[in-house]
Amino acid sequence: MLFERKHYLNLLQNADGNGMIKVITGIRRCGKSFLLFNLFRKRLIEKGVHEDHIIQVNLEDRRNKRLRNPDVLLQHIDNMMTDTDKYYILLDEVQLVNEFEDVLNSYLSVPNAEVYVTGSNAKFLSKDIITEFRGRGWEIHIHPLSFAEYYEVVGGEKAEALEQYYKYGGLPAVAGLERAEDKQQYLREIFETVYLKDVIDRNHLKNADGLRELVRILASIIGSSTNVRRIANTFKTA
């Protein structure tokens, strides 16, 4: 399934030329990489940008491991900028680069460089990330699919589609799965290996089992009043 993400695509396009580093944030697996590397890249080409003026680096790719060195990445980008025409620098998972802030800030003074980056770790979940760019960071925050985006592609009976959306959410990968078992497995795995880990890392938590139990309790009482004191006492006596 191809979700066009028109709203966010327009935000990326409208930020072109604003003199800032465009920082695409959002929870993991919400579609940041696809938006940048597929949809936005396609739109740039449709606007007439030559492919050799789009510098695209997926830093999560093992084959690009050497580019996680900040000096090597800088040299790589500089070598690809061979004229004074505008270049679009698209970097995915930039937090994997040591001192990535310095790398990106280096291009603030380059007049023909337009920089767009994504990041997914705990640091990029913080509003403090924009301050790293000397007041010249422009955040574009991506959410999972809205129901309108979901239904535009899924179609069918609207009530049934809404029930599925409420039950499984709007992560693009989940929407593309057919079987309920596959949806549940994907969500379970991403919760355990990604979301829970991000919360633990960001807050330096030591009791992962306690956090997992807290999430289980909160998930079981959605739509009901929450007695914070009772929950706290549960953990005190555990």
Describe each region flagged by the PLM:
Residues 32-33:
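Conserved lysine of the Walker
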